[in-house]
Structure formats: C-alpha cells, structure tokens
C-alpha cells in the first residue's frame, strides 16, 4: 500500500482508530520520513498527564483536547507532531483541520476476528464496543497487513 502525504500542506498528522488497528505501526513508519518530528502517543499522555481521567466518553473528549494542546505546542516549536489516539470527535477533528493537522482513521481489514481475542474488549467504556465515533467526515486508511510505503 502506498500512502502519499504532502508535508508542505500539513503541520502534523494524527492517527486514530481502535486498539490494535495499527496506529503505532503507522506512526513509526512515517517518522522516518519527517525531520523534526515528535511522537505523541495517547497512551503515554494518559499515563503522564491525564492520569486524572477515566475511559468514559466525556473523559476521552478531555483527553483528546489535551493531546491537541500538546500538538499545538509542538507546532509552535517548529516541530512536526505525529499523534496516535484511540478516540476522535467531530470538534477536535475540525480544530485539527484549522491547525493543519491531517487526521486519519486507521481501519484493520481483519479486525472482526482479532477483536474477539483482545482482553480490552471484555472491559467497559471501550471504543468500538460501548463508545462509538461521532458522525463526521473521516479520511480512512485500511491496514490490510500489506507493506506500507509513505511518500512525502
């Protein structure tokens, strides 16, 4: 799979999708193509900054708002944020566009089979099980386990 990304048009990139969809994989792939990048993993932000939040939909909205704030600080420092989170909503997606951050939803082709084996899907407040994405226009990238080539 070849993914073309215009570095001159965007100041950052944000991958979002269900647990196990490949967000970290895509982040790792694109970082080698972009100088002055800073990786922002939603799990790390939750552990280091948002430990006061739980996994409810309301707290997920607060979490991604904080992640956007971090991304904006990175952009102001003339660096390129590469972000990955599970959740995204219509408002933050809109603010990302205003800040020239491209948002991509990662979908896994074989996810139905995989989901049954993930322990996380036995818990509550799980995106894709109890919490669903709001209805907004999303750019989708299908992870079908084929080799990925980023063209920047």
Give the positions of each predicted feature:
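NTP-dependent small-molecule kinase module
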Residues: 1-8, 29, 33, 98, ...
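Walker A/P-loop
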Residues: 24
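Conserved substrate/cofactor phosphate-moiety recognition/catalytic segment
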Residues: 27-76
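Small-molecule kinase domains that catalyze NTP-dependent phosphoryl transfer to phosphate-bearing small molecules
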Residues: 114-152
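Hydrophobic anchor at the beta1->P-loop junction of P-loop NTPases
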Residues: 13-15
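ATP-binding Walker
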Residues: 21
